[in-house]
Amino acid sequence: MPQEVKERQVQALTAHFAKLPAQDNRETILIDAGLVSMQLMLTARAHGYDTNPIGGYEKENMAEVFGIEKERYVPVMLLSIGKSVDEGYASYRFPIDKITQWK
């Protein structure tokens, strides 16, 4: 990306997100972070690593534990990456026709 395009994009996006309500920005952050997390997990798997997304943790303590700015960063999930010791097992999934309505 040429530098001038980058600068124009950053300026436009900064102005756009500054106008949005905090909740709208938070929802955008959560969606984007979920997509980035998914891509990281797929990339790790492609390189022979296993991953485990973790959502059950004390989000209010994350900034202090990791030494990051609480007002700037939104905790989304913890993600462990490594080599598994044991083979995983398949979990049950409902058939799509049991959980989806097509209208």
Positions of predicted regions on the chain:
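Acidic, surface-exposed loops and disordered segments
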Residues: 1-103
